[in-house]
From Swiss-Prot:
Tissue-by-tissue expression: Expressed in placenta and trachea. Weakly expressed in brain and pancreas. Expressed in fibroblast. Weakly or not expressed in lung, liver, muscle, kidney, spleen, thymus, prostate, testis, ovary, intestine, colon, leukocyte, stomach, thyroid, spinal cord, lymph node, trachea, adrenal gland and bone marrow.
Residue spans, topological domain Cytoplasmic: 1-8
Main enzyme class: transferase
Cellular localisation: Golgi apparatus membrane
MF term (GO), any: metal ion binding
Protein name in UniProt: Polypeptide N-acetylgalactosaminyltransferase 6
Organism: Homo sapiens
Lumenal domain ranges by topology: 29-622
InterPro entries: GalNAc-T (IPR045885), Glyco_trans_2-like (IPR001173), Nucleotide-diphossugar_trans (IPR029044), Ricin_B-like_lectins (IPR035992), Ricin_B_lectin (IPR000772)
Membrane topology type: Single-pass type II membrane protein
Length: 622
């Protein structure tokens, strides 16, 4: 049978050839025929018949073509990709010689103050030294005396990262992009600012470092003016740009980004030190996916001794970014599913939010995603806003554990803010109105200042940001909670009661006291109407929550009133009787487990046998 098919093959080819020649002849004649048909109506029917014949012939030719043996497999069609692949890059991996730092460190004295990242130590102080130290703390909120005596180019000792980080190789294709390092400062100490700069120069491969841009947010200190300009000229790739008016971190970073020339923007604070191999893992992840915003593993530089908390070879317990319903950024340990997903320290950590001080991002993606909200003022809320925006609009936030950068964490800011701290509330309202949908109500219940701004619409024009959300086809906030941060407890959108709990006997309000994260006694305090320590919710599950940040519940244990972590978490959980409360019409607040009622007798909240005639047991949500 196969032999017979092969013998007939030439005949089929000849038939196809003849049919094709006849088709060309008729097609040539067709042009003149159509022109004549328009003038001679009697020819129209013949032309239409010829069209039908041509259709039949074409169909026959297609059938013959399809019935012929497939002698050659076609090459697969090229698939479109989101980003073009660089065809000029070399195969293999970057060598240590290629990743040589921009500058080699000068010889180090191992006995120098703070050498190898060790703590600054001093046992004897003169009166002048003590005065200098105290003035440094007052001015910078860290030990500037110690910083000033540590080398600007100090080494941090050997590379102590886990072996998989030290041995990590980076592919040449796609190539690692160049980066512009942007450092914003305002009246920063000379030593911490310059140590940050030198740290970048000594740890960053020359082929990857395009420039270091120092953005001055209207500093008033003389050493940060002409002296700084002259000093950085010797550093080749360092330049200073300035905001003449104090506009804050957000605007300053936008200024730095606008003049940056590299493919990737890397933002650092002005009191950092970079560890071995900090940049390459960040750039490698962006080379894999330009929609990923990556942060280093941020470790502590002690604000008193400037000791650098070095990574350890066995790895450490990692944290990721979170937020609470007052829209404050925080840290939390990794959930089990994230620990299981990561095989070793080279695997990135998915993070619902990021600190926002230290990160790298593709410049083109930064612009695509909407940079920063340029109507936000000074500082505050911009990191949470960007976190929501990146995730909801198709990007990702990741922490790269093999990238380690130290940061001086201060307990308070040494700087004053134009317009006061109300700018933070205004920034938070802007992010809530654009990204949080109906969940913004949860925030407004906890921040009455923000709620008032929202009601009065005194937070500026957000039309451009809403248009950006629409243009990028971003997900809603419910999607974010379900897919990015399912561990987040979502309070009732409409709790049964909320606000301050006022006692009719004392005219004071129930208050959790300062810094009560659970375990401390509650107090009675003058009602201030600002929420905060006096904010409570009576939920549909019948628990009484103080949940500005942590979810804390009132409970009764051994007859005593207490405040602790809530047992109801929304999934496969229930409210225990000692946390369940009944708000009766007689204004008593009765605990279901003990059967006793909340009282303010002796101006201290406690439990007592229920007595509706006692005004100290009568409460009202206000």
């Amino acid at each position: 049978m196969r032999l017979l098919r092969r013998r007939h093959m030439p005949l089929r080819l000849a038939m196809v050839g003849c049919a094709f020649v006849l088709f060309l002849f008729l097609l040539h004649r067709d042009v003149s025929s159509r022109e004549e048909a328009t003038e001679k109506p009697w020819l129209k029917s013949l032309v239409s018949r010829k069209d039908h014949v041509l259709d039949l012939m074409l169909e026959a030719m297609n059938n013959l073509r399809d019935s012929m043996p497939k002698l050659q497999i076609r090459a697969p069609e090229a698939q479109q990709t989101l980003f073009s692949i660089n065809q000029s890059c070399l195969p293999g991996f970057y060598t240590p010689a290629e990743l040589k730092p921009f500058w080699e460190r000068p010889p180090q004295d191992p006995n120098a103050p703070g050498a190898d990242g060790k703590a600054f130590q001093k046992s004897k102080w003169t009166p002048l030294e003590t005065q200098e130290k105290e003035e440094g703390y007052k001015k910078h909120c860290f030990n500037a005396f110690a910083s000033d005596r540590i080398s600007l180019q100090r080494s941090l000792g050997p590379d102590t990262r886990p072996p998989e980080c030290v041995d990590q190789k980076f592919r040449r294709c796609p190539p690692l992009a160049t980066t512009s390092v942007i450092i914003v400062f305002h009246n920063e100490a000379w030593s911490t600012l310059l140590r940050t700069v030198y740290s970048v120069l000594h740890t960053t491969p020359a082929i990857l470092l395009k420039e270091i841009i120092l953005v001055d947010d209207a500093s008033t200190e003389e050493h940060l003016k002409e002296k700084l300009e002259q000093y950085v000229k010797q550093l080749q790739v360092v330049r200073v740009v300035r905001q003449e008016e104090r506009k804050g971190l957000i605007t300053a970073r936008l200024l730095g980004a606008s003049v940056a020339q590299a493919e990737v923007l890397t933002f650092l604070d002005a009191h950092c030190e970079c560890f071995h191999g900090w940049l390459e893992p960040l750039l490698a992840r962006i080379a894999e996916d330009k929609t990923v915003v990556v942060s280093p593993d941020i470790v502590t530089i002690d604000l008193n001794t400037f000791e650098f908390a070095k990574p350890v070879q066995r790895g450490r317990v990692h944290s990721r970014g979170n937020f609470d319903w007052s829209l404050t950024f925080g840290w939390e340990t990794l959930p089990p599913h994230e620990k299981q997903r990561r095989k070793d320290e080279t695997y990135p950590i998915k993070s619902p939010t990021f600190a926002g001080g230290l990160f790298s991002i593709s410049k083109s993606y930064f612009e695509h995603i909407g940079t920063y909200d340029n109507q936000m003022e000074i500082w505050g809320g911009e990191n949470v806003e960007m976190s929501f925006r990146v995730w909801q609009c198709g990007g990702q936030l990741e922490i790269i554990p093999c990238s380690v950068v130290g940061h001086v964490f201060r307990t308070k800011s040494p700087h004053t803010f134009p317009k006061g701290t109300s700018v933070i509330a205004r920034n938070q309202v802007r992010l809530a109105e654009v990204w949080m949908d109906s969940y913004k109500k949860i925030f407004y219940r906890r921040n009455l200042q923000a709620a008032k701004m929202a009601q009065e619409k005194s937070f500026g024009d957000i039309s451009e940001r809403l248009q950006l959300r629409e243009q990028l086809h971003c997900h809603n906030f419910s999607w974010y909670l379900h897919n990015v941060y399912p561990e987040m407890f979502v309070p009732d959108l409409t709790p049964t009661f909320y606000g301050a709990i006022k006692n009719l006997g004392t005219n004071q309000c129930l208050d959790v006291g300062e810094n009560n994260r659970g375990g401390k006694p509650l107090i009675m305090y003058s009602c201030h109407g600002l929420g905060g320590n006096q904010y409570f919710e009576y939920t549909t599950q019948r628990d009484l929550r103080h949940n500005i940040a942590k979810q804390l519940c009132l409970h009764v244990s051994k007859g005593a009133l207490g405040l602790g972590s809530c047992h109801f978490t929304g999934k496969n959980s229930q409210v225990p009787k000692d946390e369940e409360w009944e708000l009766a019409q007689d204004q008593l607040i009765r605990n279901s487990g003990s059967g006793t009622c909340l009282t303010s007798q002796d101006k201290k909240p406690a439990m007592a046998p229920c007595n509706p005639s006692d005004p100290h047991q009568l409460w009202l949500f206000v």
